[in-house]
């Protein structure tokens, strides 16, 4: 796992994104100092952002630390919303994007994976965003039905991208 994390710190990756991907990097927020204390916030799935409401949702796990989330949110001007979640075996869900995705008009969430005491506040916050809440169960979560991404084309149309396995688990 250390080798994986080291690979993610290479500045060449940012240069490649700029040169080959056409992305501009205007700011780099380096939270890697937390790794020395064993605290992580893996960038690709630990946090699901609601850009419209400026809320950063994070399912706490060994890969997602609440203190690092708080620092990220303070730097970005987002409200942190941390919660716990487990799979069907009681194991902590490792990344938030396994159970939650947020699009313009809808949200996909596996609320049954969240402890009862945290479920109502989470659902209330998601509903307050004005989006339709689409509930999935733990079996659908295990098939990555919560791991979806809304993409926008140049003409403004949107599509919801997900794996064939995820799509096959919707009714």
Regions found by a protein language model. Give the residues of each.
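The feature marks the mature, well-folded catalytic cores of soluble enzymes
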Residues: 1-171
